[in-house]
UniProtKB/Swiss-Prot annotation:
The active site is at 600 (proton acceptor). Keywords: ATP-binding, Kinase, Nucleotide-binding, Phosphoprotein, Repeat, Serine/threonine-protein kinase, Transferase. SMART domains: DCX, S_TKc. It catalyses: L-seryl-[protein] + ATP = O-phospho-L-seryl-[protein] + ADP + H(+); L-threonyl-[protein] + ATP = O-phospho-L-threonyl-[protein] + ADP + H(+). This is Serine/threonine-protein kinase GE16371. ATP binds at residues 485-493, 508.
Length: 750
């Protein structure tokens, strides 16, 4: 606090005043001397009065600078009156006591303005004709301090709280001040946390719940404790008990000073962002999180971490666990989510290999070269030895036993990218699982075309067993009915046109009588589609539920489904396939971020928009009849045989990654015109055995002109083990999908 120079208020009196203070019973001075002293005091009083306005201006200026209330001029006058009465009570002659901004002889005093100062020094100067004497009166001024409250002191100290993202053990968290003044309601805190998390990580929705680190639900601001950490949950997610960012700085070391916000923002930006959020491309931060040290001095430095974005891509590596031979062989999927830094990769490896000695401290390639930086995991080597604190025998430990070599070769066989010669006839596409009705040209259709509109509608509906009067009135009055564009086991689809705008839509009529016992699938389809809003997912315009039928007005795509397009062109170029897999991957990423699995991804359920030359411009995912929300492992056996994942057939429980398997089958078909797993005469048992084995080929001549990049992507999407299979985000992160195929020469050799 700066020091303010406060001019002293001098009290001038004659020598008689001084003598009266020292000896109240002393004799009275001569009259002439008294008159002279009174004249001097009167002159001082006049000068002080003239400068009173300047004193008030100085006080007002000081009040504005300190931003705190000060005593008014009237209050100061009262104090001077008290002083005057105190001293004049002992005077026998008339004495004038004046208040001044400075003594006549130029004396002044300095008063500290700090909050700890509890005394105010007042200097009283008494002048006489022969000399002067100073009387200093010191009095405590606690009452003045009470009249000058510190407006900067908050009424309640804000709590220092750290929040994590539920289930995300790599997110460093965000620390914010929390108080009742800052957040008037719990919902306001939810809104602020949603905004902060969306800036740094991808979340499936708004923050709805807060848990403490033990999983107890927090229901009010009063339950939050200062210095503690909490977990934010979105869309009513259950609490996930994981080790939340063990390498982050302890909360006790964080401060809420003016530098705390830039620190938290910088730390939060270290975590890599997904390249696709709700179908829109977003940038990734070039920085990586420097996690907790491994104990052996991990060589991750700032200059290397800046290259993380360029080196990290989805990749499956093989791990050999240290121990007694033959050693255990495991696999691990590395991607931007679990590999933002070298230390994070070591943590991921530790959780997979589970060493007896604890944490993985050292990693070596198959040739015995030490892995010392993040980029080493994403180069040509894909097999690594994992060690803890035990000593390493370089002469023996890096030699593979026959059993170990066999296990590695089996793994590599499922990742095969080399072409083999196809023996026998070319495999064929499976039969389409639904019927498509082409336009009829017979005489009956011609008569129907020339009939009135209602008659044509009746003709179309009668062929499907639906009466025109059964159509909901709002659909019948708003749209005109067109041709049948497809049907399935439980539904039929018409092309309809809006009467006013002329825009085309699709009307899906679901027959409830054919869905006895499966009505929940219909309800789930409508419930899921109402939640969706993505450029590569068919939009639901209107739904009408009646006793016998469910009517869905859907977005219309002019090019038809992908199955028909494959039938016409047999195979697509890599550039066209890349467009379609990007759009499909974006749609799956959006679905999976909301915890929704489609369960029936196949060419028949993918609609395409074509240009005048037949090139695919856009792909949209449709038909959510089997879609559902995933809260735990699913066990229901469903889907289409050609595209079903092995975990569904094995009935061991499945989740979101069955959609990735189906997308891998589709990408394979796009490039060569037939699926990787086939059986003679489409027999299901041999087909299922082939799918469970996970072994397939890239046979020549159908794959001879197709690059290794897309083969690598397919191999990672068709992993039998869902734990190492690519996620939908990994599909989008793969260099072939991005279009950066220059990487493949050095980093994707098998």
């Amino acid at each position: 606090m700066e020091l303010d120079k406060v001019k002293t208020h001098s009290l001038h009196c004659n020598a008689a005043v001084l003598s009266s203070l020292q000896a109240p019973t002393s004799a009275t001075s001569p009259q002439s001397f008294t008159s002279k002293a009174n004249a001097v005091a009167e002159a001082a009083f006049i000068e002080n009065s003239n400068q009173q306005q300047n004193v008030q201006k100085d006080l007002n200026s000081h009040n504005r600078d300190c931003d705190s209330p000060v005593s008014s001029t009237s209050e100061l006058e009262k104090e001077f009156d008290d002083l005057r009465k105190l001293h004049t009570s002992s005077l026998t002659n008339s004495v004038v006591v004046g208040k001044s901004t400075g003594s006549l002889n130029g004396d002044y005093s300095i008063t500290s303005a700090t909050s700890k100062t509890k005394t105010l020094e007042s200097v009283v100067t008494i002048n006489s004709a022969t000399g002067s004497a100073c009387l200093t009166i010191a009095s405590t001024a606690d009452h003045i301090k009470k009249r000058i409250p510190n407006s900067r002191t908050p009424t309640r100290k804000a709590l220092r709280i750290k929040f994590y993202r539920n289930g995300d053990r790599f997110y460093p968290g965000v620390t914010i001040p929390v108080s009742n003044e800052r957040y008037r309601s719990f919902e306001r805190l939810f809104e602020d946390l949603t905004r902060l998390l969306e800036e740094n990580v991808k979340i499936p929705g708004a923050v709805r719940t807060i848990y403490n680190m033990c999983g107890k639900k927090i229901t009010s601001l009063d339950e939050l404790e200062d210095g503690q950490s909490y977990v934010c949950s979105c869309n009513n997610e259950n609490f996930k008990k994981v080790e939340y960012n063990p390498g982050s700085q302890p909360l006790s070391n964080l401060t809420l000073t003016n530098n705390s916000r830039p620190y938290n923002q910088r730390l939060a930006k270290h975590r890599p962002a997904s390249p696709l959020k709700n179908g829109l491309l977003v940038g990734s931060s070039p920085l990586a999180v420097c996690g907790g040290g491994t104990g052996n001095g991990s060589p991750l430095i700032a200059s290397k971490s800046s290259d993380r974005v360029t080196v990290v891509h989805p990749r499956i590596v093989t791990l050999i666990r240290s121990g007694t031979k033959p050693r255990r062989i495991m696999r691990l999927l590395l991607n931007k989510r679990n590999s933002p830094s070298f230390d994070h990769v070591l943590t991921a490896i530790t959780q997979v290999v589970r060493l007896d000695t604890g944490y993985v401290r050292k990693v070596f390639t198959l040739s015995g070269i030490s892995v010392v930086q993040l980029s080493d995991f994403f180069e040509s080597d894909d097999v690594f030895f994992a060690y803890g604190t035990e000593r390493i025998n370089t002469a023996e430990d890096f030699k593979l036993e026959p059993e170990e070599l066999k296990a590695i070769n089996v793994i590599r066989k499922t990742m095969r990218t080399a072409g083999t010669t196809c023996k026998g006839p070319k495999p064929k596409m499976p039969i389409k699982s639904k019927k498509v009705y082409p336009p009829s040209v017979n005489s009956e259709a011609f008569k129907a075309a020339t009939a009135p509109e209602d008659d044509r509608h009746a003709t179309l509906l009668t062929s499907t067993g639906i009466e025109i009067n059964e159509l909901p009135s709002n659909i019948r009055s708003t749209y005109t009915l067109g041709k049948i564009i497809g049907d399935g086991n439980f539904a039929i689809v018409f092309k309809i046109k809006h009467r006013q705008t002329g825009d085309s839509y699709a009307l899906k009529i679901i027959d409830k009588n054919k869905c006895k016992g499966k009505e929940h699938y219909i309800d789930a389809e409508v419930r899921v589609m109402k939640k969706l809003n993505h450029p590569h997912i068919i939009s639901l315009i209107l739904s009408v539920d009646q006793n016998t039928n469910m009517y869905l007005v859907l977005e219309y795509v002019s090019g038809g489904d992908l199955f028909d397009a494959i039938t016409q062109v047999t195979r697509f170029a890599e550039s066209q396939s890349r467009i379609m897999i990007r759009h499909l991957g974006a749609a799956m990423t959006y679905l999976h971020s909301m915890g929704i699995v489609h369960r029936d991804i196949k060419p028949e359920n993918l609609l395409v928009k074509l240009d005048e030359h037949g090139n695919v411009l856009e792909l949209k995912l449709a038909d959510f009849g089997l879609a559902c929300e995933v809260n735990d492992l699913l066990y229901a056996v469903c889907g289409t045989p050609t595209y079903v994942a092995p975990e569904i057939l094995l009935e061991v429980g499945y989740g979101l990654k069955i959609d990735v398997w189906a997308a891998g089958i589709i990408l394979y078909i796009l490039l060569c015109g037939f699926p990787p797993f086939v059986a003679p005469d489409n027999q299901q048992e041999p087909l299922f055995d082939a799918i469970i084995s996970g072994i397939y080929e890239f046979p020549d001549p159908y794959w001879s002109d197709i690059g290794d990049g897309v083969r690598d992507l397919i191999a990672n999407m068709l992993q039998s083990d869902p734990d190492v299979r690519f996620t939908s985000e990994d599909i989008l992160d793969h260099y072939w999908t991005i279009g950066n195929e220059g990487n493949e020469c050095t980093t994707y050799k098998r």
